[in-house]
Amino acid sequence: MLKKLGLVDLHASIKQKIEDKTGLMAYDHVPEDMPSPFYFIEVVDKRPEDTKVMWCEVFTVWIHAIAEAGKSKIAIYDMIEKLEEALTEELVLPEEIDILRQSEVGMQSLQEDETGEMHAIVAYEIKVSYGFKVKI
């Protein structure tokens, strides 16, 4: 049987890395009236990407950065920079799973929300391998 990476394990690893390296909270569900700044993690896609010899999957993750309300965009730019730096370090996943690729896909959106807070979405792709295919 093949042990795959669960979404909970992936989310927990991303959350831990962001909180440890940025000093800000990261959520999967933002509590109502939560004061900014914070990050919000959303796994938006999971697809197989096997090779000839390995069992692989690719996860697409959107990380929302919510900065304090204000006229300047410097706070959101700073949050994006801290996020990018934090995720240059490899995530810690269960030991039977190998990360083959952990890369930023780019900024998907940068806008001002109705609350006056700046909101950016930065996308990442994480490709993992579960092991080698064996012919018996």
Task: Tell where the protein language model's regions lie, with residue ranges.
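Short acidic/glycine-enriched loop/turn segments that link adjacent beta-strands
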Residues: 33-36, 116
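Charged, amphipathic alpha-helical segments and their flanking helix caps
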Residues: 1-29, 43-136
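Low-complexity, acidic Ser/Thr/Pro/Gly-rich terminal tails and inter-domain linkers that flank the onset
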Residues: 36-44
